[in-house]
Regions:
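Cytoplasmic membrane-interface "Motif A"-like loop-to-helix N-cap segments
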Residues: 75-86, 277-291
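Helix-loop-helix hairpin linking two adjacent transmembrane segments in secondary transporters
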Residues: 142-190
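Extracytoplasmic gate region of multi-pass secondary transporters
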Residues: 33-34, 217-259, 266
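C-terminal transmembrane helical hairpin of 12-TM major facilitator-type secondary transporters
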Residues: 282-330
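Helix-to-loop junctions at the C-terminal end of transmembrane segments
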Residues: 65-77, 268-281
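Conserved MFS/SLC helix-loop-helix module at the cytosolic interface between two early adjacent transmembrane helices
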Residues: 64-100
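Cytoplasmic helix-loop-helix junction between adjacent transmembrane helices
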Residues: 108-147
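A late C-terminal transmembrane helix in Major Facilitator Superfamily
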Residues: 337-372
Length: 407
């Protein structure tokens, strides 16, 4: 069992910043490719649909490795896991920077996916181990906002840097930043030990692996993460291209719209975590998020159908306010449902669902864009995913109601 932190030791603010950076490191690759989309497409001579497959590779790699890395998060030291996150992201950015073809960019994307697969198990385990119970949900909200902080940095830095320095220069610059954060993480984070070995069996001291089933609630959360993740990442990936190709805006403006979504997402994730801390039920918050996300899709479609580019900014803000907060509520729900020694495995299962949605969303959006010539069908699929997620939320509410649990 993962030992609790000594009562006398309180986690430092530096550790919170390390967790935020750990959540944002891997996604910086994703947002860099998305925000530099037209530059990358010209460099590699690919279509927008083909560019979307890069994100599919990222999240397919994350989905495939999530369960195994979730188990690893229950055993490895925190510093070892932080090295996987920051070192792997830096390697992915360097490889992507020099990629001469789409297959090489796929290889970089796979590395980035692995680093992202362990980020939630790592940060959840650290919070459960060293943070007092009354502060955990607040910490989850802050560390989850690291993803949107990466969206903000990527949306502002990559378009301007790629236009000035090319994709190679922009990606290498980001790799230097991640390398510096890696060093700071190892210095600032306290030396957290790895979890003790699994219990041994009666014969020969062999390790006994925990194969007990996870609570059904974990799988409900994983399904919600899959459906909201599908729409979230489809929108994140194609928002800059939607701005350029459909609304006639510049790449810098498209990146700025993604940055707006990221800024609002940072604030919304902290806000949703505060609602959880104040006692709101996860299912109530998730239902509001799903309905709000559908409204955001409607705004994007209105911007297209009415030819009103100004609505892009409204849609980006609604996107950040709603669906970008889903993972905070889901992760906070997991913290309350799963004991510390199994939290890595539970988070890995949830991450598998989320990253499967992340992989499928950009793929569908890109394919539908190439087939139909616009983004309307893709956004319709995104809205359908949010409505299905709402249905799963209602099923979860019914399930926990039968158990007498306030969730």
């Amino acid at each position: 069992m993962t030992p609790p932190a000594p009562a006398a030791r309180r986690p430092s603010a530096a550790l919170l910043w390390v967790l935020l950076a750990a959540m944002g490191a891997g996604p910086l690759f994703n947002y860099g490719v998305s925000a530099s989309s037209t530059v990358v497409m010209d460099r590699l001579d690919v279509t927008s649909g083909q560019l979307g497959t890069v994100m599919t590779v990222v999240f397919a790699a994350a989905a495939v490795t999530s369960l195994g890395l979730g188990r690893a998060a229950d055993r490895l030291s925190a510093r070892a896991q932080l090295s996987i996150i920051f070192g792997g992201t830096a390697a992915a950015l360097v490889l992507g920077a020099v990629a001469p073809s789409l297959p090489v960019l796929y290889a970089a994307a796979a590395v980035a996916g692995v680093t992202q697969a362990i980020s939630n198990p790592t940060t959840n385990r650290i919070i459960r181990t060293v943070v007092p119970p009354e502060r955990r949900i607040g910490w989850v909200g802050v560390k989850q906002s690291g993803v949107q902080a990466a969206q903000l940095v990527g949306g502002l830095f990559f378009p301007a840097a790629s236009l000035a320095l090319g994709w190679t220069g922009a990606a290498l610059g980001a790799a230097v930043l991640i390398g510096a954060l890696w060093v700071l993480a190892l210095v600032a984070a306290p030396p957290l030990p790895g979890a003790p070995p699994p219990a041994t069996g009666p014969v020969g001291g062999r390790r006994r692996r925990d194969t007990s089933p996870l609570p059904a609630t974990v799988w409900f959360f994983a399904a919600i993460a899959f459906l909201t993740g599908l729409g979230m990442q489809a929108t994140n990936t194609y928002l800059p291209l939607f701005a350029v190709e459909t609304l006639g805006m510049t790449l810098v403006a498209g990146g700025a719209a993604a940055a707006v979504s990221g800024v609002v997402g940072v604030l919304s994730r902290i806000g949703w975590s505060r609602r959880m801390s104040s006692g709101d039920r996860p299912t109530t918050l998730l239902a509001v998020i799903c309905l709000g996300a559908v409204a955001g899709v409607a705004v994007f479609l209105a911007a297209d159908l009415l030819d009103l580019p100004a609505l892009l900014w409204v849609g980006a803000a609604v996107h950040g306010l709603t669906v970008l907060g889903a993972n905070v509520v889901i992760n906070a729900g997991l913290l309350s449902e799963v004991p510390a020694e199994r939290l890595g495995r539970a988070t890995g299962a949830n991450s598998m669902g989320m990253y499967a949605g992340f992989a499928l969303g950009p793929l569908l959006m890109g394919l539908l864009r190439d087939v139909t010539g616009d983004y309307r069908a893709g956004f319709a699929v995104v809205a359908a995913g949010y409505l299905l997620a709402l249905g799963v939320v209602l099923l979860l509410r019914r399930h926990v109601g039968r158990r007498g649990v306030d969730a």
